[in-house]
Amino acid sequence: MVSPMTKKKRTEDAFRAGIVEDRRPWGMFRRYPHEEVGSIKIITVDPGGILSLQYHDRRDEYWIVLDQGLEVTVGDRIFSPAANEEIFIPRGTPHRLRNPGPAPARVMEIWIGRSGESDIVRLKDDYGRN
């Protein structure tokens, strides 16, 4: 018989093994294991880093700002959110993050919809990506 603690440890190990870390020109993100209908990741934007101005066809995004200091673009609006501010980005809406500050800054991104990293339509990218 397998103890409840052993089952919990196996589940935790499987979860941790599914975490994917990906470096990008602007910083990095950690994507956590997910079901087909969504995902959660922590995006870290390095000082001076800027994500592409982009939108998604198959997902909405919900951001929770973890660190102050980011500049956020959603549609035509550009603003500097406070830590713990929550931002909803409907699919099809151009958006980006920029870090003009001296320290790395993070956002928790929750996406809703059947989508993946391939569902990125870049409108403008400072690193020459399509």
Q: Which residues does each predicted region cover?
A:
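Double-stranded beta-helix
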Residues: 6-24, 96-130
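Short beta-strand His + acidic residue motifs that chelate non-heme Fe in jelly-roll/DSBH
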Residues: 52-54, 72-73, 89, 95-101, ...
